[in-house]
């Protein structure tokens, strides 16, 4: 739309002010876009132009301020691409110097633009992904995406962190804290580095390990991927654990695949529900071949045995017996409140010292959660070579009581598992933490007790606001009931997943594509009434640790405050006392906290 040249007053209260003219221009632009959006070519080209203009602005302003010449810096950085030779040490490390497994070779040999891999634990999916990248990421930048910050950091540390020649980086909102933990030192330079400068680093990397938000956030106009767009446009992509995406995030994945049909993509998971596989097949057509399944022999090992129980309390005798025998026990609850209460009760009846009982969930300060995750992994660690191969590094009993966070962030193998009822895909993921390294038929017990309620709504009247888990919860109960008392394998569970009837609906709105010229960001993941906050109780500690240069609240940035952030369920009536670095500050005493149990609202249950 066009407006004629005119003189006007800049006073905001004038009917013909600059503000009013901007409003009218925006209204006319929206009207024009409503007509243009019917043309798919206009939609895609507008989105590309929007991303390129934003990225160019970021590069131009940041590089000029830094004394760089954009015309020289940009092509030099974007020319950093993967070569097959760079990935050889990573693959050799993953295979321990041996030949890749047949499953891994099959993934590496896939010649389709999009490859779908469905394989359980122990198959070496990550190593298979780097074999795939040798073929499909050569001449491109490799984006290896994970669903959470924890899994992204673990993936980076386990495979790329110490690679001497590969230009790589870890990108997510909390990556600096995790990188400091890997280095074992704190960062001395506390000057704030704007998000745009952080995003520019990806332009010059050959491999980027990140949360899926760093890539798919592009579909919702989120800043980090918009600033990184030239590097994304040069990418090949691995999307791991796609079963964990909620309906909105999975919808953005669908729009990404639709928008970029020529991009090389690897989709991986231990399980993909039929409803998701169906829509992927319809979208991809011949761009994807048959899904590649895990090793047939490995997935056929009888490694689990369901033991239904009437209640959580009826599991206690099994737990005390296992702990008395020096076993490692993993107990998975569906809510943080249940996990904390279960741990408190276990200190009274378990028969082990309280320090052998560890609570692990999402509601810790981020720095404490990182430490807690390392502690849990250390409790279950095995020697991988030498005379002690196959023995626990830390012998003796342990009881880890966790929530859904264990489904992806913990590469551990428990001797006994207990779990509340949960959707079948989640149950399959939880079982990946039990008898993980089985090499033959040797079923270990998984005790399952009843559960109803949030976060797995099964009431029809609440489907619109709380989701619909009726089919997946019913499928899980049927699997436990019908397989109870008999050995079962990953293949048995995969067959039940394939037969699960699910009517899941995906949200495919994209602010980047559908909103045309607008750049307002939209939510990438489904809302869970969550809020990430800082406690007023921690402000004194923050001032001390940040030091004199950054101790003033006016200098606090979101990046500096990440170690003290806590994700909480939103409590009705919550009013932050103020903001710090963009985070709401909860009034002193309103959020109880301990490094052993994490955070809870003082007046409400979680």
Please give the residue ranges for each predicted region.
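Post-DEXD/H (motif II) to motif III coupling segment of the RecA-like Helicase ATP-binding lobe
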Residues: 226-239, 243-295
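Interdomain hinge/linker at the junction between the two RecA-like core domains of SF2 helicases
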Residues: 273-323
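Inter-Walker segment of RecA-like/P-loop motor cores
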Residues: 164-221
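Conserved Walker A/P-loop ATP-binding site and its immediately adjacent core
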Residues: 140-162, 172-176, 272-277, 336
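C-terminal helicase lobe and adjacent C-terminal extensions/tails of nucleic-acid helicase motors
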Residues: 341-348, 352-379, 384, 388, ...
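N-terminal accessory nucleic-acid engagement/regulatory domains that precede
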Residues: 1-86, 586
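Conserved strand-helix element at the start of the C-terminal RecA-like helicase core
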Residues: 141-152, 322-347, 358-361
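Walker A/P-loop
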Residues: 111-132
